[in-house]
Design a protein with these regions (language model features):
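Internal nucleotide-binding/catalytic subdomain
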Residues: 152, 156-293
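Peripheral (often C-terminal) accessory segments that flank ATP-dependent C-N-forming ligase machineries
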Residues: 310-423
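Short acidic-hydrophobic, aromatic-tinged amphipathic segments that line or gate anion-handling sites
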Residues: 43-49, 121-125, 156
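A conserved helix-loop-beta module that forms one wall/lid of the active-site cleft
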Residues: 90-151
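Active-site "cap" helix and flanking loop/linker of ATP-utilizing ligase/carboxylase catalytic domains
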Residues: 246-268, 285-355
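ATP-binding N-terminal substructure of ATP-dependent carboxylate-amine bond-forming enzymes
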Residues: 1-94
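Solvent-exposed alpha-helices and their adjacent loops that cap or buttress functional pockets
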Residues: 21, 36-38, 90, 112-114, ...
Length: 423
């Protein structure tokens, strides 16, 4: 089988490494891939948003199955375009990817179908949003409607901060068209949990829960990032919580999408907050999370490609999806200065014995050498029998990898360890 994977980050590297385990796979193409993925797949210089280019390549190269990993191509209809050419895909069609593509859509969906989420208001113009903020309780949360590279959510501690956030989105257009309409919602408190799930529109199979670390610096200080590390499973996500989420959130969401004529097939990501009033949805993503994938897939004992194809063919209930009961920790090594300005082009040294634990994101090949090319450079994942062991193992591997201006948090998993002690 010839497999095409759209995307070029650490998440895609994790998917590709897992798919390589399937004996039927003879060739994997990554569009565009990256310098590290090149060790595991043939990277082709076609951008993830170039839908026509992706389809042309897939047809000309006799691709048997495509996996569209990032949000942009999913929202732009990459799956629709590939399926029209008879190429089966893993990932939702554009009509279903809107669950991430529009915050206004997803909030209204939850309201209509009684899925627990934060109270909210939608605004289509700056004036009415600013007027609303005069009396709105703070802290409050301002969200751009469309995709914004994970940076379109601002938690405002004061009214002035909230107003500035509205102005930056609606007047200054920092997120372009994504800020044409915005959601202002209540600020929720409680532990956050990420749950990725496989769904074929009928069955929902949650993967192992995980805990993300969004802030750039230790102690959850600094700016929000795409994620500086993850651990799995998330200790706050107990069996009782999982049962409640399945009944009140996971199954109702899939049923709601079906009722709207937007059947979702692929990986549906639930960003949850465990509030004093029960679990609530903070966000939906229409794809595997990054860096959650880098801890969840190493714990998957079933064959990933077999599960994905069952999703595509709407027979997920027929396959076994089994996860290990071990713990995993992923530490992201970034370029110093990320998520703001940073230098790139530094050579990366990864010892051979560590490479199998590394998922490369922001790196390119230059004269045959791997060099830094992005903010988040790579993720290092370790799996062990306990969380403390997984954390320790992950950091011991990090210390063996070198590049100038490397920077990483030194407290990934610390919050999870505290939670384990509390429980």
């Amino acid at each position: 089988m010839k497999i095409l994977v759209v995307g070029g980050g650490g998440r895609e590297h994790a998917i590709i490494k897992k798919i390589k385990e399937n004996k039927e796979v003879e060739k994997i193409f990554a569009l565009p891939g990256n310098g590290g993925i090149a060790a595991d797949a043939e990277c082709v210089n076609v951008g993830a948003k170039d839908i026509d280019g992706i389809v042309d390549f897939a047809v000309k190269n006799g691709v048997d199955y495509a996996i569209v990993a990032p949000d942009d191509p999913l929202v732009l209809g990459a799956v629709d375009a590939l399926e029209e050419k008879g190429i089966p895909c893993f990932g939702p069609r554009a009509s279903a990817a809107i669950i991430e593509g529009s915050k206004v859509f997803s909030k209204n969906l939850m309201k209509k179908y009684g899925i627990p989420t934060a109270e909210y208001e939608v605004f289509y113009d700056e004036e009415s949003a600013l007027e609303y903020l005069e009396t709105a309780p703070v802290p409050t949360v301002i969200k751009a409607d469309g995709l914004a590279l994970g940076k379109g959510v601002i938690i405002a501690e004061t009214r002035e901060e909230a107003k500035n956030a509205v102005r930056s989105m609606m007047e200054d257009k920092v997120f372009g068209k994504s800020g044409d309409q915005i959601v202002i919602e209540e600020f929720l408190t409680g532990p956050e949990v990420s749950v990725l799930s496989f769904t074929d529109g009928k069955t929902v199979v949650p993967m192992v829960s995980s805990m993300d670390h969004k802030r750039a610096h230790d102690g959850d200080a600094g700016l929000n990032t795409g994620g500086m590390g993850t651990v799995a499973p998330n200790p706050y996500y107990t069996e009782a919580v999982a049962k409640e989420c399945m009944e009140k959130i996971f199954l109702p969401t899939v049923a709601a999408m079906n009722a709207e004529g937007r059947t979702f097939k692929g990986c549906l990501y639930f960003g949850l907050m465990l509030t004093p009033k029960g679990p609530k949805v903070i966000e939906y993503n229409c794809r595997f999370g990054d860096p959650e994938t880098q801890v969840v897939l190493p714990l998957l004992e079933s064959d990933l490609l077999t599960v994905m194809r069952a999703v595509t063919e709407e027979r997920l209930s027929e396959v076994e999806v089994k996860f290990s009961h071990k713990d995993a920790c992923c530490v992201i090594m970034a370029s110093d200065g990320y998520p703001e300005k940073y230098e790139k082009g530094f050579e990366i040294s990864i010892p051979e014995e560590v490479a199998k634990n590394v998922y490369v994101a922001g790196a390119a090949l230059k004269d045959g050498k791997l060099v830094t090319s992005g903010g988040r450079v790579l993720g290092v994942t370790a799996v062990a029998d306990s969380l403390p062991e997984a954390i320790e193992k992950s950091y011991s591997l990090v210390e063996k990898i070198h590049f100038d201006n490397a920077f990483y948090r030194r407290d990934i998993g610390a919050r999870a360890l505290l939670a384990k002690e509390e429980n």
